Amino acid sequence: MRVTDFSFELPESLIAHYPMPERSSCRLLSLDGPTGALTHGTFTDLLDKLNPGDLLVFNNTRVIPARLFGRKASGGKIEVLVERMLDDKRILAHIRASKAPKPGAELLLGDDERINATMTARHGALFEVEFNDQRSVLDILNSIGHMPLPPYIDRPDEDADRELYQTVYSEKPGAVAAPTAGLHFDEPLLEKLRAKGVEMAFVTLHVGAGTFQPVRVDTIEDHIMHSEYAEVPQDVVDAVLAAKARGNRVIAVGTTSVRSLESAAQAAKNDLIEPFFDDTQIFIYPGFQYKVVDALVTNFHLPESTLIMLVSAFAGYQHTMNAYKAAVEEKYRFFSYGDAMFITYNPQAINERVGE
């Protein structure tokens, strides 16, 4: 399969730079996986699409203000993007500089350059940085960090992004990108879903900056997926197995929830799914056998991204590309602050040939 098979034309004007004034007021394109049929509506239509007893699985990671600006003590501006927090004093990060810092290099971070840190080691493309400060990494980031808006949102971050680029149920700090499908859920909608009898469970996957890295190979089978930490606790496993047992659906909110659930299923030894607390490099593309997820709520993804490949594996390649074509024609808003899709699983997708 070629990466270019997942390309599509997207006018710049359809990339959303700000979210809708109300979280749940975005548009919703529903794709019936088995038939490819499309329905246009608004996000609150989700209420009618879910049945009592269906299980919604959310990712409760919280975005950290992961972008830092500063300079090397020896001179030269730097930009630091945290990939993950290693402990209370250390981070693993991407560093942009005219000349990469060497181990032992002193860094002065923050708009006033008051935070002192040392680059202690390099791991491939990533740098290990230790803060020389009494405060924890999280406190430092909350104090001097900027929200790490995706590269295609072509504007500086604003104070409002600290809440807007965060789900209302976010709980565990550690992500450098929001699980964006969840941005559309507000408290009134969650309340209505609960009142209808829809069950809810929460996994954690700390989305890394690798999610924005382009696929740099021609053949997708050659792509090496970035690693992210995921948690699927026992209560989620119990909720999934109970939903399946009573004939209800497991609906993943976002591709990160999909990757968490399917990672836990892949690693399971004795059951459909078992608890999972580990890094995952799961790469889902056409031909992948889904084991857990029956339906998916997700945003519109970048051309040639691993995420449009995941959706194609779920709904079928042709159905997915047709839906994206329709979304462009109907001027849906794309990417993190854009509109959403509701997709049901196509069991025939696994047999489909791509790019022929």
Curated annotation (Swiss-Prot):
UniProt-recorded Gene Ontology molecular function terms: S-adenosylmethionine:tRNA ribosyltransferase-isomerase activity
Keywords, in A-Z order: Cytoplasm, Queuosine biosynthesis, S-adenosyl-L-methionine, Transferase
Gene3D superfamilies found in the cross-reference section: QueA-like (3.40.1780.10)
Any Pfam family matching the protein: Queuosine_synth
Any one of the GO CC terms: cytoplasm
Pathway the protein contributes to: tRNA modification; tRNA-queuosine biosynthesis
EC number: 2.4.99.17
Catalytic activity annotation: 7-aminomethyl-7-carbaguanosine(34) in tRNA + S-adenosyl-L-methionine = epoxyqueuosine(34) in tRNA + adenine + L-methionine + 2 H(+)
Single GO BP term: queuosine biosynthetic process
Major localisation: cytoplasm
Subcellular localization: Cytoplasm
Entries under InterPro entries matching the protein: QueA, QueA_dom1, QueA_dom2, QueA_sf
Family: Belongs to the QueA family.
Function: Transfers and isomerizes the ribose moiety from AdoMet to the 7-aminomethyl group of 7-deazaguanine (preQ1-tRNA) to give epoxyqueuosine (oQ-tRNA).
Subunit structure as annotated in this protein's UniProt entry: Monomer.
Protein name per Swiss-Prot or TrEMBL: S-adenosylmethionine:tRNA ribosyltransferase-isomerase
Species per Swiss-Prot/TrEMBL record: Escherichia coli O127:H6 (strain E2348/69 / EPEC)
Lineage: Bacteria, Pseudomonadati, Pseudomonadota, Gammaproteobacteria, Enterobacterales
Gene: queA
